[in-house]
Amino acid sequence: MIIGPGMVFSGGVKILEQPVPYVAGLFKTTYAGYFADVPSFFATATPTTYGTNPSTSVQTTTISEAGSDDGSNFSIQWLGYFLPSTTETYTFFTASDDASYMWIGANALSGFTTANATVNNGGEHAVQERSGTIELTAGVYYPIRIQFGEAGGGDAMTFNYSTPTITKTTNVTGRVFYNPATNGF
């Protein structure tokens, strides 16, 4: 079923048939304040900055954010699509201080909660890594949503993925895209 230019539904997941006019990277929005493990925070909060992944921190090739340990409270959301290069089980990881969540597929678009996150690394904590797995098909553009929040103290965020044939990596070159017309999906 075609829903719009280049969009179809397959098994309940909105996928992209081709990346044009989509561009490399994820759309990043930063907010003042800690989202306190409430994913809907981002729908009502006013962004302080937004744009694509800057090359100095959250890059097109790496989704990572590291702070200065200044105790500032902030939250970040990244939106876009993940394009698997192989058909197999993908393991996604977030290593964060404090909370981070990642959704891929239909749950990234709507109905996303902490309970249905692909990766649930919630709560206030020092850097810790959590992971989740999902079967993905090569060549299908899956919606992806990553949320991160810093409540105080140290702050860090790194996103990785691996498969049985792909060594764990932060390199998402050619794997993530976003729609500049809608700032994400």
Task: List PLM regions with ranges.
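Acidic/polar, compositionally biased interaction segments
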Residues: Q18-F185
